[in-house]
């Protein structure tokens, strides 16, 4: 399917303005000026955001400049939130003393996060379930509108279905039946000469989780790094 047609279909299927945030990349590679204007829309109405970033070797060695770019672009599209947080896919916090807290949204804090991210190379099993569960269990709040942004390139877990069922259960508010947080994801390309199975698994998993939890999955390719 044509990339532009696929993006348009996703745009009409999601809440107005969400794809303006998720993630500028799918807009910047399109030359259509009308599409570019979508990037100027306000993002969704979340007042707190959490980045869950795969810090595995494949990401750090192959995709890290793109990761830095996309984190900055996402932050820039939120002029002001009440707080944000960063952890890796295993639920390890960028700043361990901040577990259970929100980092204040200030220019200085944003700069600190980006600078720390440049060298943030932790061991990772390339499975976002731990980070997603940690984020939901620790931060869900009925008075807050929270969006998760999962960045990754592979899913190495044995099966997708148990992960989807676990997240569906954890992310459901018992009182209202609604979702506690919105889950969005960005899939990064792996080397063309590497096995593609785990990358396909990540895309399948995150597309399903995003569909179930009010968000959007966007898959990048090498052109998006430019």
Q: Which residues fall in each region the model found?
A:
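Pro/Ala/Gly-rich low-complexity, hydrophilic intrinsically disordered segments
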Residues: 37-43, 178, 224-226
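Sec-exported extracytoplasmic/periplasmic mature domains
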Residues: 57, 72-83, 118-122, 136-144, ...
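Von Willebrand factor
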Residues: 42-101, 104-145, 147-151, 157-158, 187-200, ...
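Extracytoplasmic/secreted proteins, especially bacterial periplasmic and envelope-associated proteins
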Residues: 62, 66-73, 108, 112-116, ...
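Bacterial N-terminal signal peptides that target proteins for export
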Residues: 3-21
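Acidic, polar low-complexity linker/tail segments
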Residues: 15-22, 29-50, 56-63, 104-105
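VWA/integrin I-like adhesion module and closely mimicked acidic/polar interface patches used
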Residues: 119-120, 154-212, 218-220
């Amino acid at each position: 399917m044509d990339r532009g047609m696929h993006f348009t279909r996703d745009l009409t299927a999601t809440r107005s303005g969400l794809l303006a945030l998720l993630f500028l990349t799918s807009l910047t590679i399109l030359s259509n000026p009308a599409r570019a204007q979508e990037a100027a829309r306000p993002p969704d109405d979340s007042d707190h955001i959490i980045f869950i970033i795969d810090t595995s070797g494949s990401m750090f060695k192959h995709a890290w400049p793109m990761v830095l770019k996309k984190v900055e672009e996402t932050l820039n599209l939120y002029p002001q939130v009440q707080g944000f947080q960063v952890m890796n896919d295993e639920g390890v916090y960028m700043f361990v003393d901040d577990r259970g807290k929100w980092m204040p949204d200030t220019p200085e804090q944003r700069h600190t996060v980006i600078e720390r991210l440049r060298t943030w190379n932790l061991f990772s099993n390339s499975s976002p379930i731990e980070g997603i569960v940690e984020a939901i269990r620790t931060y869900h709040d009925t008075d807050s509108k929270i969006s998760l942004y999962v960045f990754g390139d592979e899913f190495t877990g044995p099966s997708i279905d148990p992960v989807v069922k676990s997240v569906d259960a954890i992310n459901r508010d018992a009182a209202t039946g609604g979702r506690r947080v919105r889950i969005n994801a960005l899939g990064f390309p792996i080397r063309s000469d590497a096995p593609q199975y785990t990358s396909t698994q990540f895309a399948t998993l995150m597309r399903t989780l995003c569909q179930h939890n009010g968000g959007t999955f966007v898959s990048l390719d090498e052109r998006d790094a430019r």
